[in-house]
Curated annotation (Swiss-Prot):
Protein name listed in UniProt: Ribosomal RNA small subunit methyltransferase A
Function comment: Specifically dimethylates two adjacent adenosines (A1518 and A1519) in the loop of a conserved hairpin near the 3'-end of 16S rRNA in the 30S particle. May play a critical role in biogenesis of 30S subunits.
Source lineage: Bacteria, Bacillati, Bacillota, Clostridia, Eubacteriales
Positions bound to S-adenosyl-L-methionine: 21, 23, 48, 69, 94, 115
Chief place of localization: cytoplasm
GN (gene name): rsmA
Amino acid sequence: MNTKEIVNKYEFKFNKNLGQNFLVDESVLEDIIKGAEISKEDTVIEIGPGVGTLTKELLERAKEVYSIELDGDLIPILQEELKEYNNFTLIHKDALKIDFNGLMENKDSIKLVANLPYYVTTPIISRLLKEKCDFKSLTIMIQKEVAERIDAEPNCKEYGSLTVLVQYYCNTEIIRKVSPNCFIPRPKVDSIVIKLDRLSEPRVRVKSEKLFFNVVRSSFNMRRKTLWNSLKSLNIDKESMENAFERAGIDPKRRGETLSIEEFGKLSDCIYDIL
């Protein structure tokens, strides 16, 4: 059965508070599966399985699938629809509260697939990256504007701290755009399927990741300010900051949105050296 048929079969009522929009376009489903590149060696962690339409396709291809679902009304539906699969584990929990490192422990070749409610997209991606969870890739359907921020380059309005965070740890690839007409109920925004391939090492080597991300965050807090004014929040004396900018070869009159990840790394290391 397809998604609409399963929804009708169980007379499922969508929960607006959970931001539920179920994918009904099979071509998008196929592109997610193709993009995720799932094999029998892979353990898949799926966030937001809905009524299990994508989950079935994952179960047919993966070694095992762990699906995380918050909505208690979906649990019996998933249990019934997927009862024939012995490689399926259903976790009834909020993905924001999951111990991902614990879940991934002693598992090889972990790939994540997610159709996230838009309000939890950034918190979950940030957690997976900052907590250094051991996964190979994350194939995710998210709001178009967020995907464009993740995949952005310097000198554009989409480029920001989320861009730097994700691209510090991952390569990014936009797989396809998804129209609101591909969902029930129909959302008010366009979506994009994007894949994040985890790098074996961060894109740049820095002396302090904590300082690096503090510099990045401060540089984008007030986008129209120069780096000199933005980085005053670090509470470093004027002479030391002048020295750091000079050693990094970066004009303090530039704005954060003009710096590459490599330049942020160079600047944060020069600040680290003078602290």
